[in-house]
C-alpha cells in the first residue's frame, strides 16, 4: 500500500491506475532502475547514469572529505559496487543500514568490525537480490585505516568517501559511468521507496549471517522519499 504523507507532493490527486503505471516504468532512455526506488511523478529529476564530485563536511570536527556520488544502470550496478569494495583492502568494517520498522526519514545502522573482504564479498553476492531491490536496505563498507568508504545506499546510489579517489574513478569510467559536474540524483527530489515482507525477511537473514544482531544505532536524516510496501 502507498500512502502519501501530505497533499503537497507530486503524487497528490493521482489515481491508483496512474500510480501503478508510473511504478511499472523501470527504464528511462538507456538507464535501468532497480526495483528499490522510483522517481517523482513530475520527473523533475530524470534518472540517468554518471557521477559528480562533492565534499562531505564533518559536523563535529569541520573536516572536509572528498566524495564521489554515482548512479549506474541496473545491469552494471552491483558488479561495479563489488569492484569498488574490492579496492578497500583485505580487511574491512561493514555498516548495514535499514529503514524497516523506523519512522519516515530515519534509518538504523548496524556495525561489524574486522571482517575478511573475501568472506564479505561472497556473502554480498549471495544477497545481491536484496541489496539491489530493497528500498529499505543499504550497506557501507569501509577501511578505517585509509580511511575510505564505499556506500551502496537505499536509493541504490554509490557514494565513495576518502582520498585518493582516482582508483575508484577508473572503475566508474571503465564501466561507462562518466563524470558529469551538473549531475542530479533521484534523492534530490521526491521519490518512492519500495520493499516487501519477503525482502525484509531476506534483510534479517543477511543481518544474522554478518553477525549484526547487536550494535544498532538510530540515524535521523532528511529524505524526500515515501515508502511503498508490496
Language-model region placement:
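Structured alpha/beta or helical-core interaction and ligand-binding surfaces enriched in interleaved
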Residues: 1-157, 161-230
Amino acid at each position: 500500500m502507498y500512502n502519501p504523507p501530505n497533499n503537497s507532493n507530486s503524487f497528490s490527486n493521482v489515481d491508483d491506475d496512474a500510480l501503478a503505471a508510473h511504478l511499472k516504468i523501470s527504464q528511462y532512455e538507456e538507464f535501468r532502475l532497480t526495483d528499490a526506488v522510483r522517481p517523482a511523478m513530475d520527473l523533475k529529476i530524470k534518472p540517468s547514469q554518471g557521477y559528480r564530485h562533492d565534499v562531505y563536511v564533518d559536523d563535529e570536527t569541520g573536516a572536509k572529505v572528498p566524495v564521489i556520488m554515482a548512479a549506474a544502470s541496473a545491469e552494471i550496478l552491483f558488479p561495479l559496487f563489488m569492484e569498488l569494495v574490492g579496492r578497500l583492502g583485505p580487511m574491512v568494517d561493514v555498516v548495514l543500514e535499514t529503514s524497516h520498522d523506523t519512522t519516515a526519514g530515519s534509518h538504523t545502522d548496524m556495525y561489524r568490525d574486522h571482517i575478511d573482504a573475501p568472506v564479505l564479498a561472497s556473502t554480498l553476492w549471495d544477497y545481491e537480490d536484496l541489496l539491489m531491490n530493497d528500498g529499505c536496505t543499504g550497506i557501507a563498507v569501509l577501511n578505517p585505516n585509509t580511511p575510505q568508504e564505499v556506500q551502496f545506499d537505499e536509493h541504490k546510489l554509490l557514494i565513495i568517501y576518502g582520498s585518493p579517489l582516482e582508483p575508484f574513478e577508473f572503475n566508474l569510467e571503465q564501466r561507462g559511468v562518466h563524470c558529469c559536474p551538473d549531475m542530479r540524483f533521484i534523492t534530490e527530489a521526491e521519490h518512492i521507496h519500495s520493499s516487501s515482507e519477503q525482502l525484509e525477511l531476506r534483510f534479517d537473514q543477511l543481518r544474522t549471517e554478518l553477525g549484526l544482531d547487536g550494535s544498532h544505532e538510530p540515524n535521523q536524516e532528511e529524505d524526500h522519499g515515501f515508502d511503498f510496501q508490496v
